[in-house]
């Protein structure tokens, strides 16, 4: 295209220059001729339109309130929303002598491309002229070229501004012409239009690599208010720094030059809702993955300024970008965001019609939802209850996660949820999600599992910590099969949280009836709990965690639940039955599951405390008490724990209770026998016999009293003796090698002593340990078939079901 030195194309897209008007005239004439009308017809229509009283924004350049669609597609059109008549660039009037300097830039209709290429070096030289009027005019023409190149309607296939000397000359103008705002403004406008094309970005970044002082000169003018110079400086900086291919080095330079301190004040001072998103995004680029910049932004009150934008602005693009930036600081400065009322301000955005804004808001809220606050969250909780059943999977997931954090350890929020049908909504959502889970695969299934996990967590929090907790527990457990299904799926994350919820529920005695009666197929809660416990025990020495869930936590929760539910006699009978099945009674060296847990040195103290409490409850079952009474390893462990009353009083007290119960059981037998154990008499003779206690077995090599059939003479040499009285045939006089709890070597070593011969006997059913029958069946043959055809001693990990299914195989 030819350039006329007397024509000016302003920086603003909405301003038509004389050149563009001339082009419009030629276009109109061409169309009129081919459409069968005269050229003057088009001119007359334009004149009539100009003389009307209404204003479309074309004459006064006042942009409309609503942003145009093109503003989201073409960056240069952002200028139209930030201009006014006061910002018009005055056309410099040149003298004849000054005009002669532009004679080299000719106007040729036949070869416009040649003259454009030729004009660039000429204009580059004129921008270095000593006459400021000439420089001003040259910069305006260079800006016109840059603007036409970035316009998709008029751009050529190849960029014309490709010489780095143009960039260096523009840099010199920014440095040397500070006192001439018109020149600075056009220079920055030229920079901006060059950067609107990828070839221009590459040119500028290459020039910055050679001479990095381009960035400091741009930053210098971010604070220049006259003639809206700061707008073009900010837009140009944003274009350069946000380039993903070459902007990294420029970002480093901008951080070194403290650009964040120049940009942040405009969050409060700028009024244009079209420029503010650019400012917010520029701050995001500067702060991204850089702690030092984030600290500077926080010290300048940046997060508070962002919250003010959310509170008083309505432009969706601005709100979305602001929440995106706040999301960065929600992990960096969450307590201050909450203290400044961030959760209340963000809650107002959850009713917005933009899905991306709602999702970004929820993500920010999720990051700050775990911060304690005394401010009421009623509006936020109400909005979350509406969104938790959203069709958008991400929105409902974030909503459930936020609710889980808000109700944890917050009595007011729990009461609000219970008083506003929150429990009903959550249970319904959990039921629907469980039904949909089976049809999903891979990523969708993973997201649904996270959603279900959050729902269960929220319900678990609501089951305790407020006056209506009993009613909540009863309502949640109205459909116990919903939670039994979670246990049967054996997904580690869901297992942990479901077990945690069940632990709250079984604390209420009235709910033990549905717990006992609920079944899916032939599986009930007790059977599945013991199965999960066995699987976890087999994995205890193999791996510490499975998919982020600690194996120790699963063991602890199972032991805790078994401890609570064995208060019920019917459930106790069922627990004893499943604990005595071969796969559960032959763990390690041939011990039942609770004893196996006690043997493990890497199990935590609270788990061992629960295991001891479970054993105490099991001692109330006559058949199980006989089994435990014969276990020499258990007796030795209890004796060692009992001696540590100074360091571990709770464990010592539990061990003491079990030993006293054993002793009382032996005393009942002792009254009918001529012999008694002198060791037990000396150990527990001073204790009261009124409280159920337990006792250790004889370790002196004398005749064993209380367990099994009594013999008048020692039968240790009898080859048949072990088949009838297992406890007296075992060598129990070996010294225990660790008197201290949790000190090397471990207090509960995994003994290498072989299992009793009874367990190795292929005809084990004929031994003194008859196979028990659960309370709900009349005979063992009618009990669940899963245990009917098991090998005599398969070992702790020979079953394929002993391992949690991997996520890949599950989904």
Swiss-Prot record:
Q: Which residues, if any, are the signal sequence?
A: none
Q: What ranges does the record give for the region Disordered, renumbered to this chain?
A: 763-811
Please provide the record's keywords in A-Z order.
Activator, Cell junction, Cytoplasm, Developmental protein, Membrane, Nucleus, Repeat, Transcription, Transcription regulation, Wnt signaling pathway
- Note whether Ribonucleoprotein occurs among the keywords: no
Q: In which tissues is it expressed?
A: Expressed in body wall muscle cells, hypodermal seam cells, gonad sheath cells and vulval precursor cells.
One Gene Ontology term of the molecular function aspect = cadherin binding
Q: What happens when the gene is disrupted?
A: Abnormalities in vulval development due to incorrect cell fate specification, resulting in the following phenotypes, multivulva (Muv), protruding vulva (Pvl) and egg laying defective (Egl). Mutants also show defects in Q neuroblast migration, uncoordinated movement (Unc) and reduced superoxidase dismutase levels. Mutants can be rescued by wrm-1 and hmp-2 when expressed from the bar-1 promoter. Double knockout with dpy-22 result in reduced body length, male tail morphology abnormalities (Mab) and dauer induction.
Q: Where in the cell is it found?
A: Cytoplasm; Nucleus; Membrane; Cell junction
ARM repeat ranges, renumbered to this chain: 108-147, 331-369, 370-408
* Cellular component, GO, one term: catenin complex
- Output the PANTHER family linked to this UniProt entry: ARMADILLO SEGMENT POLARITY PROTEIN
What's this chain's function? Participates in the Wnt signaling pathway which affects cell fate and may regulate the stem cell divisions of seam cells during larval development. Functions as a transcriptional activator but is dependent on the interaction with pop-1. Involved in maintaining lin-39 Hox expression and regulating glr-1 abundance at the synapses. Required for mab-5 expression during Q neuroblast migration and for oxidative stress-induced daf-16 signaling.
The entry describes its oligomerization and partners as: Interacts with apr-1. Interacts with axl-1. Interacts with daf-16. Interacts with lin-23. and. Interacts with pop-1 (via acidic region in N-terminus 1-44). Interacts (via ARM repeats) with pry-1.
Q: Which family does it belong to?
A: Belongs to the beta-catenin family.
Name of the protein in question: Beta-catenin/armadillo-related protein 1
Q: Specify the species.
A: Caenorhabditis elegans
């Amino acid at each position: 295209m030819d350039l006329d030195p007397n024509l000016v194309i302003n920086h603003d897209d909405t301003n038509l220059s004389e050149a563009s008007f001339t082009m419009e005239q030629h276009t109109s004439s061409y169309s009129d001729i081919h459409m069968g009308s005269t050229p003057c017809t088009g001119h007359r229509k334009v004149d009539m339109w100009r003389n009307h009283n209404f204003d479309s924004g074309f004459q006064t350049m006042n942009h409309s309130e609503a942003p145009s669609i093109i503003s989201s597609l073409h960056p240069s059109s952002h200028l139209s929303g930030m201009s006014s008549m006061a910002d018009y660039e005055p056309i410099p009037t040149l003298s004849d002598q000054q005009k002669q300097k532009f004679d080299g830039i000719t106007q040729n209709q036949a070869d416009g491309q040649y003259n454009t290429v030729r004009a660039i070096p000429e204009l580059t030289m004129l921008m270095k002229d000593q006459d400021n009027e000439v420089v001003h005019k040259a910069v305006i023409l260079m800006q016109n070229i840059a603007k036409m190149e970035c316009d998709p309607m008029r751009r050529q296939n190849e960029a014309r501004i490709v010489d780095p000397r143009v960039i260096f000359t523009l840099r010199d103008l920014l440095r040397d012409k500070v006192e001439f705002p018109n020149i600075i403004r056009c220079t920055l406008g030229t920079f901006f239009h060059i950067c609107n094309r990828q070839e221009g970005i590459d040119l500028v970044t290459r020039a910055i690599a050679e001479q990095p002082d381009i960035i400091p000169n741009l930053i210098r003018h971010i604070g220049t208010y006259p003639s809206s110079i700061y707008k073009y400086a900010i837009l140009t900086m944003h274009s350069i720094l946000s380039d993903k291919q070459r902007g990294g080095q420029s970002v480093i330079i901008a951080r070194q030059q403290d650009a964040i301190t120049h940009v942040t004040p405009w969050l409060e001072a700028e009024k244009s809702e079209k420029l503010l998103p650019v400012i917010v995004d520029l701050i995001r680029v500067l702060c991204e993955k850089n702690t030092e910049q984030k600290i500077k932004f926080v010290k300048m009150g940046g997060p508070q300024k962002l919250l003010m934008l959310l509170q008083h602005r309505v432009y969706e693009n601005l709100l979305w970008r602001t929440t995106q930036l706040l999301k960065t600081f929600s992990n960096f400065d969450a307590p201050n965001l909450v203290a400044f009322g961030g959760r209340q301000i963000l809650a107002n955005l959850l009713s917005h019609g933009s899905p991306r804004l709602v999702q970004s808001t929820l993500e920010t809220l999720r990051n700050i939802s775990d911060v304690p606050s005394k401010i009421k969250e009623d509006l936020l909780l109400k909005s979350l209850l509406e969104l938790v059943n959203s069709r958008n999977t991400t929105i409902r997931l974030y909503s459930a996660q936020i609710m889980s954090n808000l109700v944890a350890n917050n009595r007011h929020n729990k009461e609000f949820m219970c008083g506003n049908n929150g429990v009903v909504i959550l249970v319904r959502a959990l039921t629907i999600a469980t039904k949909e889970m089976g049809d999903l695969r891979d990523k969708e299934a993973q997201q649904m599992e996270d959603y279900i996990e959050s729902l269960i967590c929220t319900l678990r929090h609501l089951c305790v910590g407020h006056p209506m907790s009993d009613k909540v527990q009863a309502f949640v457990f109205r459909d116990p099969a919903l939670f039994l299904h979670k246990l049967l799926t054996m997904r580690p994350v869901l297992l942990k949280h479901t077990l945690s919820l069940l632990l709250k529920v079984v604390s209420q005695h009235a709910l033990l009836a549905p717990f006992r009666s609920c079944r899916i197929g032939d599986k009930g809660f007790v059977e599945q709990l013991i199965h999960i416990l066995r699987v976890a025990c087999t994995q205890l020495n193999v791996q510490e965690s499975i998919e982020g869930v600690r194996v120790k936590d699963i063991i602890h929760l199972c032991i805790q639940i078994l401890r609570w539910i064995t208060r019920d006699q019917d459930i106790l009978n069922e627990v004893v039955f499943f604990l005595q099945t071969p796969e559960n009674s032959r763990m390690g060296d041939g011990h039942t599951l609770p004893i196996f847990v006690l043997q493990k040195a890497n199990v935590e103290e609270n788990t061992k405390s629960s295991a001891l409490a479970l054993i105490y409850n099991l001692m109330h079952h006559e058949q199980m008490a006989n089994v435990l009474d014969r276990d020499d390893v258990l007796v030795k462990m209890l004796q060692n724990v009992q001696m540590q009353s100074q360091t571990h009083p709770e464990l010592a007290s539990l061990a003491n209770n079990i030993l006293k119960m054993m002793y009382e059981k032996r005393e009942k037998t002792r009254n009918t026998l001529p012999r008694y154990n002198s060791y037990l008499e000396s150990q527990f003779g001073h204790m009261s016999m009124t409280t159920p206690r337990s006792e250790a077995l004889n370790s002196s090599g004398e005749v064993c009293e209380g367990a099994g059939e009594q013999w008048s003479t020692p039968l240790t040499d009898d080859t048949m003796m072990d088949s009838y009285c297992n406890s007296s045939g075992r060598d129990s006089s070996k010294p225990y090698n660790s008197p201290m709890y949790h000190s090397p070597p471990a207090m509960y070593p995994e003994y290498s002593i072989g299992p009793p011969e009874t367990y190795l006997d292929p005809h084990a059913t004929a031994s003194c340990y008859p196979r028990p029958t659960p309370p709900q069946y009349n005979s063992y043959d009618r009990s669940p078939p899963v245990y009917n055809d098991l090998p005599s001693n398969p070992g702790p990990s020979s079953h394929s079901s002993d391992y949690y299914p991997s996520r890949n195989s599950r989904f």
